[in-house]
A protein has these predicted regions:
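Conserved Radical SAM active-site core
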Residues: 1-115
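Auxiliary Fe-S-binding modules of radical SAM enzymes
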Residues: 9-10, 31, 110, 116-250
Length: 250
């Protein structure tokens, strides 16, 4: 809370987006206060929205085998609902390519869809391909480019009630992320800097891109680059008068 206050004091114009569902759950436990009270204190300090990660796959079978100490799927959904009902927007994710079945992926998407119908609090869906290198599942083959694109397309069709689909280029790879812009994704993410999580798990993508790099990827996919803020308000539309492309946010 003190850190958020200091950030807002220095730059009140900055939108502070922080804390996954798992981290909010931990904060609530440490504070020993009701969720609503913790959220009110975070809002007063200057928290604006949350990334909403930590869902992985909701399947209880996978949860028990791979991450038994993590926030349960039922509690994740319950917490997300309360966060949305308290006025915060979040993203949502699905980690695929571990030991889950196709049916378990569909169940995960259905639960996200149901919650979105109820709260309208998700602004972006981000499918995340599992990178097995340097993990206890390194014997598993990572999702193919085709499977990664299929996950984007299925997400766009299934979750038509969520406004945006993100093609996270660090996870997908540049060529797949570019192709994803024609498969349902409308957000390529930003320039980033020194990403660690996926690179420690074997990702070979660049750790950062320039704005020019991203614009080139988007234009080559037949889309027009539009810089946005966290809540998808347009900051700069980089299209020119000759562009007839659909927009893609960065």
């Amino acid at each position: 809370i003190d850190l958020i206050k200091k950030i807002k004091a220095l730059r009140p114009d900055i939108h502070v987006k922080a804390f996954t569902m798992v981290e909010i759950d931990q904060i609530v436990r440490l504070a020993k206060k009701p969720v609503a009270e913790v959220l009110a204190e975070l809002r007063e300090a200057g928290l604006d929205s949350m990334p909403g990660g930590g869902a992985e796959i909701f399947a209880e079978r996978v949860h028990k085998e791979l991450y038994p100490r993590k926030l349960s799927s039922d509690n994740w959904v319950k917490l997300a609902k309360e966060i949305h009902n308290n006025g915060f927007k979040t993203n949502c994710t699905m980690m695929y390519g571990m030991i889950e079945t196709i049916e378990e992926r569909v169940d995960h998407l259905q639960r996200l869809r149901n919650l979105q119908d109820e709260t309208g609090g998700f602004q972006t869906y981000i499918p995340l391909a599992f990178h097995p290198d340097n993990t206890k599942l390194e014997h598993i083959e990572k999702p193919s480019p085709t499977e990664r694109l299929r996950s984007i397309a299925v997400g766009r069709l299934f979750l038509d009630n969520i406004p945006h689909i993100k093609a996270y280029w660090i996870m997908l790879g540049l060529e797949v992320a570019q192709a994803a812009l024609t498969m349902g994704a409308d957000d390529l993410d930003g320039t980033v800097s020194q990403e660690k999580i996926y690179h420690e798990a074997g990702a070979s993508t660049p750790q950062e891109l320039t704005r020019a790099d991203i614009h080139k990827l988007i234009r080559e996919a037949g889309r027009r680059p539009v810089e946005r803020n966290t809540v998808y308000d347009v900051i700069t539309d980089f299209s020119d008068e000759s562009d007839s492309f659909e927009k893609c946010t960065v």
